[in-house]
Amino acid sequence: MGPPGNDSDFLLTPNGSHTPDHDITQERDEAWVVGMAILMSVIVLAIVFGNVLVITAIAKFERLQTVTNYFITSLACADLVMGLAVVPFGASHILMKMWNFGNFWCEFWTSIDVLCVTASIETLCVIAVDRYIAITSPFKYQSLLTKNKARMVILMVWIVSGLTSFLPIQMHWYRATHEKAITCYRNETCCDFFTNQAYAIASSIVSFYVPLVVMVFVYSRVFQVAKRQLQKIDKSEGRFHSQNLSQVEQDGRSGHGLRRSSKFCLKEHKALKTLGIIMGTFTLCWLPFFIVNIVHVIQENLIPKEVYILLNWLGYVNSAFNPLIYCRSPDFRIAFQELLCLRRSSAKAYGNGYSSNSNGKSDYMGEASECQLRQEKESELLCEDPPGMESFANCQGTVPSLSLDSQGRNCSTNDSPL
C-alpha cells in the first residue's frame, strides 16, 4: 500500500492536464468507493441491529432466559462488538486506503478483532458441550449447568479470549522482523497486520483450530445420540399412544394425560439443527481466512492481498448471519415481533404466550396462568426402559403433558426456546 500522492497513481499530458483515460479511471474509482461504502454500511447496520435485537429479546423475555441462550447472548455480544469496534474501522481502512487513527488504536483495534473471533468460536465450543451434557445426562444437566455456572463459564471464555488476543499483540510478540513490516510499524498511516510465522501459526491453532476440532467432535456426538433417540421414539410412539388412550378412558376426562414425547423430541432436534447451522455458518465464514492466514506467512506472495481482505470480510459478515438463523425458533420470532411492534394486537401476543410482568419484563404465559400451573404440575419424565439403562437414550427428557384447562384450552408449552 503506497502513500497517497504517488506519481504513479495518475497520468498527465505534457501540458499538465488529465487524460481521458485518467478521468474514466477516476470515475470508476469514485463509483467503487461509493458502492463499497454503501455495502459496508449495510453490513455494519445489519450486525449492530440484529445482535442488539437478540440481546434485548433474551434480556426482556424470561421464556428465552435459558442456560443455552445465556451462551447465545455471549455470542451476540461478540458479534455486536465486532460490528461497533472492528468492522467500521476496517471499512475506513479499505476505503481511505490508509489508516487514520494512529499506531496505538491500530494495535488495539487488531486486538479487539482477534478477541471477538476467539470469544465466538470458544462460545460455540461451550454451546456444543452444553448440548452434549443436556442430551446425554438430562438428570444431571440442571445441577451441572446452572445459570450462575453458565455466567462463570462465559466470564472464563472472555478472560481466556482476552489473554490470547491482547497479550501477544500489546507485548509485540506478533511482530515480524523484515524491512517492509518494520516500515509499516513506524508509519502511523499503515495498519497492515504483519506477523511472524510463529505467532500466525500458534494464534490460529489456539484461537481457532483447537476450539473448532472440539466443537465439531462434540456436536457430531450430539447428533449421533439424537439420531438414536429419534429411532427409539419412532418405535415406541405407538406404545405410548395406546397407554395414554387407556388412561383417558379410566380418568373419564377427554385429553387429560395424553403425552407428546415425539413432539417434544422434534422440537429439541430442531433446536439442535439451529445450533448446528450457527456453528456450520461460522466455520464456513472463518475457515478460509484462517487457512489463508497460515499460508500467507509461509509463502507471502502466494495469496493476493485482495483475496486476504475478501476472506477477512467474509468472516466479518458472519456476525450479521446469526440473528437471521435465530428466526428459525418460534420463540425468537415472537420475541422479535414483539420488540419491533409487528404484532397486530396485544390479544394476539398473549395468545402466543408473551406478556409483561410487574417488573417490566415479559414472560411466556402459555394460553393462561391456569394452563401454566397445570402444565408444571403434570410434567414428568417418560422412560422407555426400566431405570438403570443408558441415560437419555432411555428417557425422553421432561415431556409436557397435553392437558386441557377448565375452558378446554391446550396447556402444552414448548420447552425448547431456541
Swiss-Prot record:
Pfam families in the cross-refs = 7tm_1 (PF00001)
Q: What is this protein called?
A: Beta-2 adrenergic receptor
* Residues listed as glycosylation sites in the UniProt record: N6, N15
Instruction: Please give the start and end residues of each transmembrane region.
Output: 35-58, 72-95, 107-129, 151-174, 197-220, 275-298, 306-329
Q: Where is this motif: PDZ-binding?
A: 415-418
Q: Which residues carry this modification: Phosphotyrosine?
A: Y141
Tell me which UniProt keywords the record has, alphabetically: Cell membrane, Disulfide bond, Endosome, G-protein coupled receptor, Glycoprotein, Golgi apparatus, Hydroxylation, Lipoprotein, Membrane, Palmitate, Phosphoprotein, Receptor, Transducer, Transmembrane, Transmembrane helix, Ubl conjugation
Q: Which GO terms describe its biological process?
A: adenylate cyclase-activating adrenergic receptor signaling pathway; norepinephrine-epinephrine-mediated vasodilation involved in regulation of systemic arterial blood pressure; positive regulation of autophagosome maturation; positive regulation of lipophagy; positive regulation of MAPK cascade; regulation of smooth muscle contraction
- All disulfide bonds of the chain are C106-C191, C184-C190
Topology Cytoplasmic: residue spans: 59-71, 130-150, 221-274, 330-418
Write out the function statement from the record: Beta-adrenergic receptors mediate the catecholamine-induced activation of adenylate cyclase through the action of G proteins. The beta-2-adrenergic receptor binds epinephrine with an approximately 30-fold greater affinity than it does norepinephrine.
4-hydroxyproline: residues carrying this PTM: P387, P400
* Residue numbers bearing the Phosphoserine modification: S246, S261, S262, S345, S346, S355, S356
Q: Which PROSITE patterns match?
A: G_PROTEIN_RECEP_F1_1, G_PROTEIN_RECEP_F1_2
What are the coiled-coil residue ranges?
none
Q: Lipid attachment of type S-palmitoyl cysteine occurs at which residues?
A: C265, C341
Output the PTM entry.
Palmitoylated; may reduce accessibility of Ser-345 and Ser-346 by anchoring Cys-341 to the plasma membrane. Agonist stimulation promotes depalmitoylation and further allows Ser-345 and Ser-346 phosphorylation. Phosphorylated by PKA and BARK upon agonist stimulation, which mediates homologous desensitization of the receptor. PKA-mediated phosphorylation seems to facilitate phosphorylation by BARK.
| Residue ranges annotated as Extracellular topological domain | 1-34, 96-106, 175-196, 299-305
What is the topology of this protein in the membrane according to its UniProt annotation?
Multi-pass membrane protein
Which Gene Ontology CC terms are recorded? early endosome; Golgi apparatus; plasma membrane
Q: Which family does it belong to?
A: Belongs to the G-protein coupled receptor 1 family. Adrenergic receptor subfamily. ADRB2 sub-subfamily.
